[in-house]
């Protein structure tokens, strides 16, 4: 059913008309206990959503809609292994990758292989063609085969393993790979080629360049076996590349790319932080899985985040959502969320193949604090756009230095308060500001936000954080009645690029293309 046909949806739309004129200043003034009422605690995490433009009635109506949309039923279908990714006929089982002792036998066996491989690198058992230890690992992948491990390796850089440096290559632009190769020693470098099908254009182009670079020094094709491993399901193509079957780590079609950090795609991360830390990452995610499955709606963190996003997007009219981590270690978390949220839910066709005719995923963007304050926060405060935000902060610093962390936290809390409450003309006037400047000093406020406090940034809490947002994305897909686990929107551009590449490299008939594309190709060829 289209969401807008639901009585629960219509009740929310009517309620929004009553809520929209209210200011967060008024909501806090009428309820001094608002923080206690609109905050959730779980396993060291604190979610403060009191600065959202909601009331008790709002949350009750949102939860009623979640019941109508059958979030609980769809969650059960996912856990039971039903093919809820119906357009591809696939189950969605990424949670089983981090299920620990309860994981399927095939998952436990795959993880044991990954652990043994990681330990062979860290212990110096695995060596390059020259007999030297591996000192550098390069992950070659793109999208879900890059964003998750890259983000997490930076987030957990305080736990970087000694004597191993892990690098990431994604873009087909030679400016990505060429400078890195120039800095590395082919005798001590290992490449991980991450591509489920082993046909991804960007990944295979970079992998071939890396292979040529290695062979220019090694001379013998046999060296590939000591310097390349693959994460793929296509043994035929990995073998053609020169990678032995024993050096291929499998994963399954029920693992979507943007949910794959828990699989062999996380191999580069495990090499960066060590296997015990990787297990703690999985443990944190597993704990969040249990919370999501077992906790009632009114205390459920992922569902609450999803409902607030739905409210802001579909009933208050927001078209974007900002992720603002006040942690430089989480600098890449907004980029990771861009794929997780927008590739999952950026769709206009429902599960029945019919147009939705409502907004779905907001545009996700952001920057680490305090950097963003000196670039785009001006727009937040006085730009006239409704921009809901998620602030993420750590109670304890990754790298404690006197004076740094208190200032960072103060800025985080100050920005969330300033966005919520603003500054009135009367307050500006009372501060003695010249009358002519008063309009420029007014801050409208009423910008909704969440603040998520983590005790620290360690593998366990990062696992919690990633699983929290994975489950938020799942809930939103159900609430919008769409399939969050396919991504047909990425296909057309790839098909056209395949047609255009030979035309740019050589000559060919351009008549099938539009005048803009023809003109640009002609200009590129000089």
From Swiss-Prot:
Annotated GO MF terms: carbohydrate derivative binding; glucose-6-phosphate isomerase activity; monosaccharide binding
Major subcellular location class: cytoplasm
Subcellular location per the Swiss-Prot or TrEMBL entry: Cytoplasm
SUPFAM superfamilies: SIS domain (SSF53697)
GO cellular component, as recorded: cytosol
InterPro entries referenced in this protein's UniProt entry, alphabetically: G6P_Isomerase, G6P_Isomerase_C, Phosphoglucose_isomerase_CS, SIS_dom_sf, SIS_PGI_1, SIS_PGI_2
Pathway, per record: Carbohydrate biosynthesis; gluconeogenesis; Carbohydrate degradation; glycolysis; D-glyceraldehyde 3-phosphate and glycerone phosphate from D-glucose: step 2/4
Active site: 343 (proton donor), 374, 494
Reactions performed catalytically: alpha-D-glucose 6-phosphate = beta-D-fructose 6-phosphate
E.C. no: 5.3.1.9
Keyword Coiled coil recorded: no
Function: Catalyzes the reversible isomerization of glucose-6-phosphate to fructose-6-phosphate.
Family named by the database record: Belongs to the GPI family.
NCBIfam families reported for this sequence: PRK00179.1 (NF001211)
Matches recorded under HAMAP family: G6P_isomerase (MF_00473)
Protein name (database record): Glucose-6-phosphate isomerase
């Amino acid at each position: 059913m289209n969401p807008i046909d639901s009585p629960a949806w219509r009740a929310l739309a009517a309620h929004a008309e009553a809520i929209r004129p209210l200011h967060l200043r008024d909501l806090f003034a009428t309820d001094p206990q608002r923080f206690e009422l609109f905050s959730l605690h779980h396993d060291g995490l604190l979610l403060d959503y009191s600065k959202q433009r909601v009331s008790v009635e709002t949350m009750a109506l949102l939860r009623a809609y979640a019941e109508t949309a059958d979030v609980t039923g769809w969650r059960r279908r996912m856990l039971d292994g039903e093919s809820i990714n119906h357009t591809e006929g696939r189950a969605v089982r990424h949670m089983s990758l981090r299920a620990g002792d309860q994981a399927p036998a095939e998952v436990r066996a795959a993880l044991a292989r990954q652990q043994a491989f990681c330990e062979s690198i860290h212990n110096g058992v695995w060596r390059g063609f020259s007999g030297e230890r591996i000192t550098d690992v390069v992950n070659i992948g793109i999208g879900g085969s890059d964003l998750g491990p890259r983000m997490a390796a930076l987030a957990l850089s305080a736990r970087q393993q000694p004597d191993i440096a892990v690098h990431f290559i994604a873009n087909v632009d030679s400016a990505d790979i060429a400078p890195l190769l120039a800095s590395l020693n082919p005798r001590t470098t290992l490449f991980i080629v991450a591509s489920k099908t082993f046909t991804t254009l960007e990944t295979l182009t970079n992998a071939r360049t890396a292979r040529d670079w290695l062979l220019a020094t090694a001379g013998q094709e046999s060296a590939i076996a000591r310097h390349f491993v693959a994460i793929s399901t296509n043994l035929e193509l990995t073998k053609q590349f020169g990678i032995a079957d024993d050096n291929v780590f499998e994963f399954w079609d029920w693992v979507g790319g943007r949910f794959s950090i828990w699989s062999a795609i996380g191999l580069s991360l495990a090499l960066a932080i060590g296997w015990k830390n990787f297990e703690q990452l999985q443990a944190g995610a597993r704990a969040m899985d249990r919370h999501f499955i077992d906790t009632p709606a009114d205390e459920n963190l992922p569902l609450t985040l999803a409902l607030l996003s739905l409210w802001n997007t579909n009933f208050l009219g927001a078209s974007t959502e900002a992720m603002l981590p006040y942690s430089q270690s989480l600098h890449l978390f907004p980029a990771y969320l861009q794929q997780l949220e927008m590739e999952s839910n950026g769709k206009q066709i429902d599960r029945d193949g019919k147009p939705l005719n409502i907004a779905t995923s907001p545009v996700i963007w952001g920057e680490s604090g305090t950097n963003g304050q000196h670039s785009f926060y001006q727009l937040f405060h006085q730009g006239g756009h409704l921009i809901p935000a998620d602030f993420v902060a750590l109670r304890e610093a990754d790298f404690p230095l006197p004076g740094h962390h208190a200032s960072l936290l103060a800025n985080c809390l100050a920005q969330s308060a300033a966005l919520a409450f603003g500054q009135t003309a009367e307050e500006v006037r009372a501060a003695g500001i010249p009358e002519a400047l008063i309009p420029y000093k007014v801050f409208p406020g009423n910008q909704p936000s969440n603040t998520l406090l983590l005790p620290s940034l360690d593998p366990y809490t990062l696992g919690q954080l990633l699983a929290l947002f994975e489950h938020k994305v799942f809930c939103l897909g159900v609430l919008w009645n769409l399939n969050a686990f396919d991504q047909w929107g990425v296909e057309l551009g790839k098909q056209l690029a395949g047609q255009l590449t030979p035309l740019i490299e050589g000559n060919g008939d351009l008549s099938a293309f539009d005048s803009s594309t023809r003109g640009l190709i002609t200009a590129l060829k000089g």
